[in-house]
Structures are given as structure tokens and as C-alpha cells.
């Protein structure tokens, strides 16, 4: 496993007075199984029916959790990570469907931003993806975490393509060409999945 914090091992922000706590969310057990093997799990706490695995990896405190599928589950899980575990960062990991012709099976997309492709109030005049009465509808990823993810991917010995791009999230499994084309047209997503924009 490539070191998620790059060569230094720890996520460094300039404020090194305490260990950073990283929450890592996967919607399904398959999406965090590999990480569970690598993280030194110290304890498991059950909150709202979810098992939060607390441990350490490369000098960071880690909280691993399976949120369940969909945006509501992901949002609730994220709030628990913040309220109960005081995480400094939240990382969403998992599988997605490619909307970018340059991405193949096993390739990696590092999110630059995320949008809800199924948020549609276009009948009221807003573009698809726009959340009414909210200042932002496209949620930007943390630039420091993007850089760290790129460095970790570059250190890996695995052979796969890594690109930066937009995550398009919705509470639906996209299984048709028409569905893919709609997301590309309206929100310019590079991949489609079911949790990221809610985290």
C-alpha cells in the first residue's frame, strides 16, 4: 500500500501540535477491506448502528467506517465522524463508474470537486446539479489532500492511470449509455458514484 501521507508518513499541515485524525469512508465492506488490513485497529466503536474502527497508520489516527450506500448514509456517517471522533479530514474511497474515456477498470480518479448529478430543479430555472438557496453546489476537495493523494499514487508500484477530475454523485446506479451522457452533459462528471458529493 502506498503511504497515504507521502514519504513523510504523516499528514503535515504546519500545525504539528497534535496527531491528525483522518476519517475514511467506504460505502461497502469491499471498499475498506484492504485498508482494514493495513491500519493497526485499536478499538471498534458502534455509533448509530455503524462500526467505526479506530486505529493508527503512519503516525496518523485513523477512523475507518462502512457508511452504507447512498448520499444520506454518507452524510450521516460523515457527521458522526466529525461529532463523535473529531476528525480533521474525511476521505471517501470506493468504486465508481467511468464517464471519462481516459479511465479504465482499476484506474484511479482523485477528486477535485464533487456535485450531485441527481439534484434537478431545472423546472424552476436552475441548472441540473444546483442546490437551491445554497451558495455552493460543486464542493471542492482540499488542495493539500489532493497533493498528498497524487504523491501517494506516484509512490505506488501498481500499474494504473491516475487522473484528477470531478465526482458526480447520485442515488442511482448508472447502467446505461443515456445515463452516462446525461451526467457528462449537465455536470461534466469524470466518474459517477453514490456518496462523494454528500461527504
Predicted regions: what is each one?
Residues 3-10, 15:
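Short, positively charged and aromatic/hydrophobic N-terminal segments
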Residues 19-79:
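N-terminal short beta-loop-beta anion/metal-coordinating cradle
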Residues 31, 37-43, 83-84, 104-115:
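A glycine- and small-aliphatic-rich helix-loop capping segment at beta-alpha/alpha-beta transitions
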Residues 99-187:
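Mid-sequence, gly/pro-rich, charge-dense loop/helix-turn segments that line enzyme active sites
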Residues 193-199:
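Short glycine-rich, acidic/polar surface loops and turns
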